[in-house]
């Protein structure tokens, strides 16, 4: 629809800017789940950059005369949200989730809405969705997205084990993953 074509042009702008600066970045969350699993319509595109890079991205966009919103935690610009930390806090537990060198080593280049974007690995997208774990009762699709990714992807289980350790999530998430068939 119209929203997706608007986002497409904006995503192309962001992709070219970040790549020109050789920044490390990746599409994450819903848009990545769309690429790896069920093709739900894309409402917006979430991007993860390395820790501390948000001010750099703000400056790059402002140099292009883009009016961005930045609250210190995330950048919002025309359907694109940029984060540098997606650490999850649930039920008093903290699951660290940042674009570290391990996650960066698993990035892949794929087409999304006409732009050749970098995307977090299916393992990283899956673990984020499972850790968030929100369902329809919260108006979210985390577990449905997780199931879709599992149906359509093969996983590097060694890498998944490493990421679970980094997230301090092995005990919490392994049973959920097993129930989902991983």
Give the label of every model feature segment.
Residues 1-182:
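Compositionally biased terminal segments of proteins
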């Amino acid at each position: 629809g119209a929203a997706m074509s608007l986002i497409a042009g904006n995503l192309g702008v962001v992709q070219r800017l970040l790549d020109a600066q050789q920044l490390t970045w990746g599409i994450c969350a819903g848009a990545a789940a769309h690429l790896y699993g069920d093709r739900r319509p894309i409402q917006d595109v979430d991007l993860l950059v390395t820790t501390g890079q948000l001010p750099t991205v703000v400056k790059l966009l402002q140099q292009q005369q883009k009016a961005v919103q930045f609250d210190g935690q995330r950048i919002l610009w025309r359907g694109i949200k940029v984060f540098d930390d997606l650490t999850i806090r649930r039920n008093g537990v903290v699951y660290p989730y940042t674009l570290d060198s391990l996650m960066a080593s698993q990035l892949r280049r794929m087409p999304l809405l006409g732009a050749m974007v970098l995307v977090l690995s299916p393992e990283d997208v899956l673990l984020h969705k499972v850790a968030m774990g929100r369902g329809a009762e919260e108006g979210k699709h985390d577990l449905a997205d997780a199931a879709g990714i599992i149906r359509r992807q093969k996983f590097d289980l060694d890498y998944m084990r490493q990421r679970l350790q980094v997230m301090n999530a092995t005990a919490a998430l392994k049973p959920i993953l097993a129930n989902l068939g991983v």
